[in-house]
């Protein structure tokens, strides 16, 4: 014990000591300490010492199957046990009546909300008692009842249940020193445990087995990947307590949901937390996971942000328990390959899809405005459906025509969009035609030639064939060709690019074959040189498309001859005359009419 000086510094406190004097006659010697520098002394009175003895008694084990008590409020059967607390005190010249406070705590090593045993009466995890010791200070005992909570509410069944008892003096009034000093065994603790189904030695040794596979691979960079982890868990040994399946997720993976094949417990209880900066999904398998238990689990996991993942990602799986011996299964690693892929689509379209030109159309002077026929557009559109980005896209378009007078198509312009850079060979529009001028519509160029009234029909000229020819395919295989080469450095997911080839129908070329019909066909191919990722691609996109424009011919409409009309009119009059004569011959015009009502009245 250290005594601090009650006097100012330099008072020489402790220069002289005097003991063995009982100043207050309490049976304990007091101490006088002198301080000559202060011309004062300090008196320290000794207090009686109470030596306490505390005992806590509880049974060694608790059997959850034996439920001999009921809860007062709910009448629920519970497994209960007795707790006995005994407190005694001894000492020299201590007071005849001594009051002590005793505090009992149940399962004190667990958080208050997670304690496994509670008092039966109050359903609390602790209580405080006031114990009055008699004159002889003989030990007094107090017994209370406690109960074990339901197994479903208990997670930790392996660790011991610790109970503690602590005795202390009642608090005194402010500024007052206690009358006695409490010494001895003021704190004691005992422990009990939950009975386990672990054989004679009461030590459970599980044999946890885990196998796993994955569906949904490979993972694609840029895609919204969903994997299904299929895991088979089993315990071939004794019960595994607090058994759980631990799934360590790689970067970019996120837990979605999990289901088991156990009827009635399909929806697993799974929680995600961090362990050493790694996300881990923990799924409860049972407490305990009993012997010969088999559980199949299907877990859905989404995986994204794979640009820097490398050629594979790994899932680490293990069954863990809190058993002291052989608690865990072997670690299972699932490696899922990562690949790159992009689906690039090429579509072609013709506007208009078909043209109708009169048989004599094309009889125009070359290089005149009338030499220009309807406008024709061939459009090719590229669309990256993803999931990845592509680099080095090359598009090649082949069109039947080189802007020469002998071609059916006069190519005016190439119009790329979406970042494409295109270069035609040979150059287009060599005549420098101002294609912004109004152009004929896709219908026949001179509508007056095709005006028809009720007397007009299609009639060929006598010197021309009376039958149009079957359509002839005009492509780069059968005609001079213009090649358009287009390049795009990068094409992201969802991006579109388009090339429009603008051309006119060259009418003088049509006049050379007045009754021929044509199918104008262009064709395009594309390929991709690489994908901008460190992982190998499944394949490099490539494809082709065709665009066709039908060029149909119509024979000139001819007027109906006048003599045809006269013959028709005379024939009609002749038929009418014959019909009238036949009716007269049979007496149709001499028949008797029935009398009218007016005629009957006159006869009367």
UniProtKB/Swiss-Prot annotation:
PROSITE patterns: FG_GAP, INTEGRIN_ALPHA. It is found in: Membrane. Residues 585-604 are cytoplasmic. Disulfide bonds join 69-80, 86-141, 198-204, 270-283, 422-486, 476-481. A motif (GFFKR motif) lies at residues 587-591. Ca(2+) binds at residues 22, 24, 26, 28, 30. One of its GO terms (molecular function) is integrin binding. The chain crosses the membrane at residues 559-584. FG-GAP repeats lie at residues 1-61. GO terms for cellular component: external side of plasma membrane; integrin complex. Integrin alpha-IIb/beta-3 is a receptor for fibronectin, fibrinogen, plasminogen, prothrombin, thrombospondin and vitronectin. It recognizes the sequence R-G-D in a wide array of ligands. It recognizes the sequence H-H-L-G-G-G-A-K-Q-A-G-D-V in fibrinogen gamma chain. Following activation integrin alpha-IIb/beta-3 brings about platelet/platelet interaction through binding of soluble fibrinogen. This step leads to rapid platelet aggregation which physically plugs ruptured endothelial cell surface. Heterodimer of an alpha and a beta subunit. The alpha subunit is composed of a heavy and a light chain linked by a disulfide bond. Alpha-IIb associates with beta-3. Directly interacts with RNF181. Interacts (via C-terminus cytoplasmic tail region) with CIB1; the interaction is direct and calcium-dependent. Interacts (via C-terminus cytoplasmic tail region) with CIB2, CIB3 and CIB4; the interactions are stabilized/increased in a calcium and magnesium-dependent manner. Belongs to the integrin alpha chain family. This is Integrin alpha-IIb. It comes from Papio cynocephalus (Yellow baboon).
